Regions:
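Non-catalytic cap/lid and distal C-terminal segments of serine-dependent acyl enzymes
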Residues: 1-215
């Protein structure tokens, strides 16, 4: 998600090249997906069924056919930050047959979707059977503002989603960091996040909280 940001402010192509060169991850093919306008971004990344279908049924098959590569039968890793983090987790929830690993940096998990109630995605995971998904979630300890003011903050909603996923039996690697909602923080952690998520094992449920006042 937010492909423009992940090729500039978070230099993922360079990060991937370095990790592959150093043998820290296997060779990968990366697709950077953007939205046509800010309004389209707001609509498409808010757990849109149409957007999830586009990613799973058009974008991923396009990679295989265009680049003449075989898509991993164990699933595709999907990543994003902010609304993109929400969209990544939503796409995996909608299409677990395609996406198996979710990397969400400061995900906007407070969002309500169409029912008007906040934290829509956490409620979907709580009410559904466990899916074959692994998660790397991170959020900044300074992300305590509510948007809008009546909704939980990114920090609170990330903690809630973490608790729901762990209670349902998902493999979750969760980090709280001394940072805000900013690309500088995300670029500093993306490489390690990718390494940890790709190396996740059956029994891994790791929670890393750097706050002295956490829940």
């Amino acid at each position: 998600m937010d492909g423009g940001s992940y090729t500039s402010m978070v230099p993922v192509p360079t990060i991937l090249d370095n990790l592959i060169h150093d043998g820290k991850i296997p060779p990968v093919v990366a697709l950077f997906v953007g939205n046509s306008s800010p309004q389209a971004r707001d609509n498409e990344l808010n757990c849109s069924d149409a957007w999830g279908d586009f990613l799973a049924k058009e974008a991923v098959p396009w990679i295989g056919s265009t680049m003449n590569v075989r898509v991993n039968t164990n699933g595709v890793l999907i990543a994003g930050s902010s609304m993109g983090g929400l969209a990544a987790a939503c796409a995996a929830y909608q299409h677990p047959e395609t996406f198996r690993k979710v990397l969400a940096q400061s995900g906007s998990f407070y969002h309500a979707n169409i029912d008007g109630e906040p934290e829509w995605l956490a409620r979907q995971f709580a009410q559904s059977k466990q899916l074959p998904l692994d998660f790397y979630l991170e959020v900044g300890l300074l992300e305590t503002s509510s948007i809008p003011s009546r909704d939980p903050s990114m920090l609170t909603s990330s903690r809630h989603l973490r608790d729901v996923l762990i209670a349902k039996g998902y493999r979750v690697d969760y980090h709280e960091r001394f940072s805000g909602h900013e690309h500088l923080a995300w670029r500093a952690t993306f490489g390690d996040a990718l390494i940890e998520l790709l190396a996740m094992r059956e029994t891994d449920r790791r929670v890393h909280i750097l706050s002295s006042d956490h829940q």
